[in-house]
Amino acid sequence: MTKLAPLITGFLRDYMPRQRGYSPQSCETYAFGFKLLFDFAATRLGTRPSRLMIEDLDAPMIIAFLGHIEQERGNGASTRNLRLASIKTFMRYVEHKVPSALEQIGRVHAIPSKRHDQKLIRHLTMEEVRAILN
């Protein structure tokens, strides 16, 4: 069993900002999403987030979390897909740190994004453009 805390710390404090060049705002957004995931997983497992192991974040747990943020938190499919993308990015990082978790990580990577309708961009009328420019 591999503790999750050192992995997420290395991911958020070193890998994302220093190696990948993510902005502080992006790192904060990722951190918030992981806080939601860890709180959800800890509640389901009856433990504290600080005691979670990487093995606890298997595909069924991730799928349950994605359902939770859609159904109970009221997030849409695009937010769900962003959370899933951040989890997959973290799992790519973990692949190099915990080779024994490769099968589990492969199952997480196999979770598909959810299709969703994209909103059409509304164009301004000439009258609206003139009002803005004047």
Task: Give a label for each model feature.
Residues 2-9, 27:
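Onset of an N-terminal alpha helix
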Residues 10-25, 31, 35-120:
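N-terminal core-binding DNA-recognition domain of tyrosine recombinases/integrases
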Residues 17, 133-134:
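Alpha-helix boundary recognition
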Residues 115-133:
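DNA breakage-rejoining catalytic core of tyrosine-based enzymes
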